[in-house]
Amino acid sequence: MNANTTVLRIGGPVGDIDVALDRPEGTPRGIGVVAHPHPLHGGTRDNKVAQTLARALLALGHIAWRPNFRGVGATAGTHDEGRGETDDLLVVVDYARQQAPGLPLVLAGFSFGTHVQIRVARRLVDAGRPAQRLVLVGTSIRADTPTEVPADTVVIHGEQDDVVPLIGVLDWARPQSLPLILLPGTGHFFHRRLTLLKHIVVDALAPRELSVAQ
């Protein structure tokens, strides 16, 4: 993503997981793990939306981890419809937490990566080690996607998304009374909207200091 990006391999359930790591300037304030779009449709950790999510996390002072899914780059294995990918991301989360113990964890995903991150978030809750925030962009809902996410989940979608239609995301969010941030006139890949997307994510996750006007 930049000259300071480090690439490393973490041992996973079926072999190496190929991960890009970016560190913020100064003392880290958190950990962020970013999941990329569908590998069978060209998705990699270098996808522009995935990189935008990583940049937003860096701007917040988070260490940003961007693994490649199975069969992408140097990551071992073959596409597993989100099951093995969930297992791999849990390994990355554990490794990242070991490297920076005590820091809050943000899970972020784009398209197919949202499906995987929702599964990861549920597994972490079940294990008693929940993430602190979940960010979903172009949310891909599948038959085995968990039906509930934390109430403070950040959900961002493009009005003109023709890959993941808005109506499906609304049908998933409605029973949870889950708010959704809608970008008018925006398609699935957020062309010409990446800077705005970054600002929205930063604003949604940044701690706020509110003062009462005198």
Task: Describe every region a protein language model picked out.
Residues 149, 154-157, 161:
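Short beta-strand/loop motif that positions the catalytic acidic residue
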Residues 159-164, 188-189:
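Acidic catalytic loop of the alpha/beta-hydrolase fold
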Residues 149-151, 165-173:
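Short alpha-helix in the alpha/beta-hydrolase fold that links the catalytic acid
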Residues 108-117:
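Gly/Ala-rich beta-loop-alpha elbow adjacent to hydrolase catalytic centers
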Residues 1-27:
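N-terminal cap/lid segment of alpha/beta-hydrolase-fold proteins
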Residues 79-99:
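Alpha/beta-hydrolase active-site loop
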Residues 77, 186-198:
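Catalytic histidine-centered segment of alpha/beta-hydrolase-like enzymes
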Residues 14-16, 25-66:
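Short, surface-exposed "cap/lid" segments of acyl-processing enzymes
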